Every structure is written in C-alpha cells, then in structure tokens.
C-alpha cells in the first residue's frame, strides 16, 4: 500500500525498473534494451492526453511522468520513448521534463451544459446535442458529436439544425448547471484554497502547497482530481498545467475532451512563436484583425513588431500582450473574495424630477456597475435602485436579474422599470444610485439571451463599446440619452 514512485534508467543498454513505495524498493526488474529502448527524437512538449503513444525528454534528459490510469508516477532517465505505463501498461500518461515543478492549473469542464444533459439522460450519449434557444436563438453549448458537423457556440440554432437535421436541442437549465458547477468547484477546493473561478465551469488553481498538504505533486493531485470529478460528478474536465495562468489556460484548450496538457516555462517562448495571436488573453476579433492588417498573425511576429506599432493598435494593453506572447504572466491566482454587492451613485447639483434626466444619469451609473462586474468576472442576480428625496429620506426598490448578468443594457432595462414607478411632477430627488447583489462567478453567457438573436447583437455591441472604453477612457462614447441630458460622471464609491 501507499503512494508509489517508478524509476526507469537505461544503463549502457540495460533497462533498470524500480518501484519505490513508502521509501522502500517494492519491485525491480532488468531487461536488455534494443534500439526501441533509446529511440531518437526530441520532444519537450506533451504527449500526455487521452491518446498518448510516447513521452520523450529533449536530448535524452530525464523526464517526469504520471499515469492517468493507476496514478503511478516517476522519472525516466536515459530513455527517449515510453509507450505505456511501467506499472499498469496504460498508454494514458502525462510526461514532461518540468512536470513535477509546475504549480498553476486551469480546469475546464468539457462541453459543460451538454455534458450535464447527457449525464442526466444516458439515451443522449451517442446523439448530437446542443443547449440553447429555439429557432430564433443561438447555441450555448454543443457536445463533441455535434461539433463534428461544424456546430459551435453562438451559432444560430436554425443554422445548426440545418447542418445536422438529427440535432437534439435542449433548453438551458441554468440553476441546475450552477449546482453541478458548484460541485466541481467544491472538488477543486478540496485540493487547494487558491481557486479562482472564471465562470460556472472553469477555474484557475494554485497548487504550490500540495506536496506538503496531500503528499503529492500538483500533477499527481490533478490527475486524481480528474478521476474524482468524473466519478462523483459524472462529467469530464480537461486540465492545463503550466508555470502561470496564461499558459495554463492555453494548455487546457489543447487536449479536449478529458485531456491533460503541459506547457513548461522553458519551452513556452518557442511553443508560442508560431501560434496565432488570438490565443492570448485579451486578443479579441478587433485587435486580431488590426494586427493581421500589419501582417502580424503569430506570437513570434508580434514580438518582432515595433513597439510603436503595437501601442498604436493595442493601446495600453500592448505591454501586457507582449509579455503574454513571451510566455510571461505575473498575475497570481486570486480567489474571489465574497463581495456582497457592487454599486455606484451620484448626488445631483440640483433636485431632479424629470424622468428622462434621471434615466440618463442611471445610464451612466449602470455602465460603471457593469464594467466593475466584468472586471471582477462576476454576474449580479438582483438589481437595486436607490433614490434620496429632498427631505433626505432614502427610497430603495429591488428586482431579480434572471438570469444573472453583467450586461449594462440588461441592468438598465430593470432600472428603468423600477424608476418608472417613482417619478412624477412632484417627486424630486437629490441622489440616485444603482447596485447589484446576489453575486456569482460569471458564466453561462446569459443563457436566456442566447434564445434571442437581438439580445446577442446587443451584447456584441456592448463588448465593442467596452473595448473602446478600455482603450480611450469612459468618455470615449456617450449614449444618445446621456448626450441629450448632459454627460454626468458618477462619484466613486
């Protein structure tokens, strides 16, 4: 019993295999190696996912491995090829020269919403399934069978149905998905308190302390976690393991579903060099298109570009994007502190009763609240309108945001509804505030919006506006209602 470590050495053509359990050699054997035992080849990358056939160290250096089937782990020295686990014979091996020293991981549930539906209904196991709206909606999630037909997220449902007539469309069950996502996060938290949720179905983990806490290196702990989530929750997750958050997130996308991919710190610059720039966090369609117009399409080309050109097209993000292209990212894994609410308010220079003027002010405040939500990767589940009357009495009105959102236009719609019942010719106010609470990690892409292409267009417009605000400041674009009433900048709170 106990945790085993395996060691394999090629000593002048003699293969030596040792299994060490609790500090003692529990098994050993010798074999005479032919050419297959020391195959040529350099590979500092990964062969550690579902279909691994070999694992190799560059220039014959020792590599480290973990078996995803039996959890055996160890070191390989003087050998450049491994076709299966030395303990159980499984080909499902994660191997890399830096495997045991990397501590930052990104876990991503595979085709999350569709996977939950297939878990709950085994009859859907071999069927093409999407979660999304009706004929006028769009795809929120597509299973991997559906993706074989070219179906992808955000595709109009009618187009997906045309691509695959036998497609099964399931309406989203956001509350149910949220519960499943919570179970996955609970499993993550059992490994480390340093869990940073990105959405309902993905998170960063800092596993720096797992050696002391669990007597396992991060790679071993993550392989065990994959097995636990599959067994206890019933869905698969893909893992990216690296030296920082940016590389870990990129890695998790390389081997799906149920994959495990490693990008080492030493290999990162060379690995990224020929990858497209949109692989980097923060490189959206607009920025990517602008760089492409300058013949900058890969990370290597980005690093070779003049600094002034990058600043011209990327603004103040140029330095950050350049660092990411080199494989550098100093952001720590930061668990979301339990923020109870996010709000913004302003006191007027004169008492106001006009509805249009109040809505224009609410528009400005809503924009501030929305951007703070997005910066913190949070959704708000309830909206609160705050009004201070001329006699200093405070009036508050609240309403649920269903589904939760970070979108300014959806928050403003609810604010206008609440405000409509509180305005009149004799109702004067000296302060207006907008706040959201019932906060949760962002995710789900606003599933009800996915049932309405019009809402999707509004979301795309808001995303474009956010990019302009980030690059040029809050006054870059002013809505018509705010312009008509005079731009009002909220006080910070």
Question: What are the functions of these language-model segments?
Answer:
Residues 21-32, 52-200, 204:
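Residues that scaffold, gate, or flank divalent-cation-dependent active/transport sites
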Residues 54, 60-67, 71, 79, ...:
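DNA-contacting surface of Y-family translesion DNA polymerases
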């Amino acid at each position: 019993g106990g945790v085993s470590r395996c060691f394999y050495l090629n000593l002048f053509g003699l293969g030596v295999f040792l299994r060490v359990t609790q500090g003692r050699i529990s098994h050993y054997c010798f074999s005479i190696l032919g050419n297959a035992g020391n195959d040529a080849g350099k590979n500092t990358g990964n062969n550690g996912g579902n279909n691994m056939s070999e694992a190799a160290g560059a220039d014959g250096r020792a590599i480290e491995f973990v078996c995803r089937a039996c959890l055996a782990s160890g070191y390989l020295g003087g050998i450049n090829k491994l076709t299966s686990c030395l303990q159980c014979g499984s080909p499902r091996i994660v191997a890399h020269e830096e495997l045991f020293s990397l501590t930052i991981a990104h876990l991503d549930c595979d085709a999350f919403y569709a996977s939950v539906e297939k878990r709950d209904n085994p009859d859907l196991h071999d069927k093409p399934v999407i979660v999304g709206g009706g004929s006028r909606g769009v795809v929120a999630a597509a299973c991997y069978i559906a993706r074989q037909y070219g179906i992808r997220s955000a595709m109009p449902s009618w187009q997906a149905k045309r691509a695959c007539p036998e497609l099964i469309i399931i309406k989203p069950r956001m509350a149910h998905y949220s519960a499943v996502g919570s179970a996955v996060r609970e499993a993550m938290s059992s490994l480390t308190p340093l869990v940073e949720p990105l959405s309902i179905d993905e998170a960063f983990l800092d596993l720096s302390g797992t050696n002391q806490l669990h007597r396992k290196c991060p790679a071993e702990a993550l392989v065990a976690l994959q097995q636990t989530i599959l067994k206890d929750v019933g869905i698969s997750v893909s893992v990216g393991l690296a030296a920082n958050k940016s590389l870990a997130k990129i890695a998790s996308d390389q081997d799906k579903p149920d994959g495990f991919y490693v990008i080492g710190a030493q290999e990162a610059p060379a690995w990224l060099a020929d990858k497209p720039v949109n692989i980097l966090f923060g490189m959206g369609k607009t920025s990517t298109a602008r760089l492409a117009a300058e013949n900058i399409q890969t990370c290597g080309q980005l690093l070779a570009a003049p600094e002034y050109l990058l600043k011209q097209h990327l603004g103040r993000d140029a330095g950050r994007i350049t660092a990411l292209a080199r494989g550098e990212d100093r952001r720590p894994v930061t668990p979301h502190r339990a923020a109870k609410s996010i709000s913004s308010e302003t006191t007027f220079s004169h008492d106001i009763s006009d509805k249009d003027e109040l809505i224009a002010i609410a528009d400005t405040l809503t924009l501030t609240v929305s951007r703070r939500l997005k910066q913190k990767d949070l959704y708000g589940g309830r909206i609160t309108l705050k009004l201070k009357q001329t006699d200093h009495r405070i009036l508050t009105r609240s309403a649920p945001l269903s589904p939760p959102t970070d979108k300014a236009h959806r928050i403003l719609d609810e604010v206008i509804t609440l405000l409509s019942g509180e305005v009149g010719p004799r109702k004067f106010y000296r302060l207006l505030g907008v706040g959201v609470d019932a906060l949760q990690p962002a995710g789900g892409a606003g599933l009800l919006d996915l049932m309405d292409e019009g809402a999707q267009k509004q979301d795309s417009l808001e995303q474009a506006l956010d990019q302009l605000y980030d690059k040029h400041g809050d006054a870059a674009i002013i809505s018509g209602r705010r312009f008509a009433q005079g731009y009002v900048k909220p006080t910070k709170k």
